[in-house]
Amino acid sequence: MHSPQLNGDKKPSRWKRLWYMGTTWLIHTRLAFHLALLAMILTLPALWLGWQLDDHLHRTVMMGLSPFKSGHLKIFSAFTFFNGDSETIRRLMDLGVLPWWTSPHFRIEFFRYLSSLTMWLDYRLWPDWPSLMHLHSLLWYAGLVAAATCFYRQIMGPAWVAGLAALLYAVDDAHALPAAWLANRNALLAAFFGILCLTAYDGWRRLGKKWCALAHTACLALALLSGELALAVAGYLLAYTLFLDQSRLSRRFLALLPAALVLLAWAILYWSFDFGTKGSGFYINPLISPVEFIRALVHRGPFLLLGQWSPLPAELGTIISGKWILIFFPVLLAFLVFLLFPLIRLDKIARFWLLGMTLSLVPIAGVVPGNRLLLFVGLGAMGLLAQLLSGLIEKPGKFPGRPSWRIPALTLGIFLMLFHLILSPLCLPGVVYSLKPLGEFFASPVKTVSDDPKISRQDLIVVNPPDYLFSINLIGALKILEGKPIARSIRALSGGPVPLEIQRLDQCSLRVKIHGGLFQGVTGRLYRSQEEPLTLGQEIHLRGLSARVTRMDQDYGPEEVVYRFPVPLEDASLRWLKWEKGTYVPFIPPPIGKSVRFSGIDPFDFFQRQGPS
């Protein structure tokens, strides 16, 4: 599997020369540096992204401007949002930081102290320079690629196939968001220290380096302090124990004890200080909702694998209904078994990659699927793909020779090679930069919200926002960051991109019909899980507003809600807005007995926004 030599007796063809040059580069001693540099170059558009989406919310926290005080030191508070205290949740619902349908036990607090520390340093050193914050993230991504390259070479040897795996990992467009989005930097840190842990563990168990026994536990602790994504390391350690460790079985599992103790200590701290999530359908806590978590794993796992292996993004899992899983999952499983079984049967390293990749799906199954979660899944997938391609090219005799396997396998192999080695690196800069128009789609309309000082004595009501997390929360966050007046509360009559019908019942009341249900869209279930449903007839009272559920959809929650205000809807204390063609414009409530309809948010508004730039 080393780089092949050119035949000195005959002049080699152009393709053979290119092949020789490529494989020679893939065994270069400085390949880790080369690939780290390549990864930075492909993700350089991140330097011009600025702050986007969650970044604005993190800015309010790190600058001490957030209306929510987590109780943690600012240095560690970037990922500790809502603590589940019912009084605090009610106060934030009154302000509009949380919508009226929020679970009273809503909690999102992540034990990401190391990642938070890196963000705190950004705001201490260059608070007004987002480009330097992005450069900081890109350096972490470069370090991650270098660490992955060293790990592939240590596990697979100095052959060109290890270099190919590292190249596939470095240019994977699934890594765009972790590299480009400041709020997702925690994934880079978790993967960086996690891969260092695996490298050190192999150095201890196979190479006999005693200092690595301590190093792998230290790296595991740092990975866990960076983000929950690092739990995937446990899956790879188990896979290593089963397939790569050559000692007696009892010694293999005994060697896992130091890492197990680190995981146990982390878990005790995590649960003792109430980290984690509760009441949210966007994040599913496996300890609180085990059945829902297993259901999510079955639904989301295939889409996560789809996002890793194919050009289709894992985000498809947010828009395709569960019934399609009954068809899609067996087909995907059959494809992987068909393609990889001969390799898995013959090669223990391939078995290590496969099991590590599969087990790394578990920690991310509790989150809405997305390519940004695939840093550990990709580690095993790219190792497998490199071995598959090298076997098809160099040692076809190791695989079945019958046309019924070889022709489809070669076809799929060529497709995967073209996608991952050509299309993916070409797309990576564009996927990185796509975060900017996505962020501006939600942030730019905030400029159309009035800066009149009177608004500080008014309640702002948005009747049809595209969603709540970014549309409504960014109004308050951006106004606070810009030092401009902000409404005393912000309300939304719906929380997703769905058609509405609003009927005026009397001077103070509206009936809102939400076609399909309130909890639609990517973030529809963020604030309330299916295990804690709203009920028919339930009424929630906030300061200046009550909401009563008058019709329900079994899957997507309230289909009809009656809103009642303590004053007539035309009162000067209320300021009404509607979302129209990518911007906010004034809305006049209809006369009593009359209705007004809104179509769902046009997805092309994202590309053809007519609001201010």
Language-model features, listed with the residues they occupy:
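Intrinsically disordered, polar/acidic, low-complexity terminal segments
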Residues: 56-60, 321-328, 345, 400-613
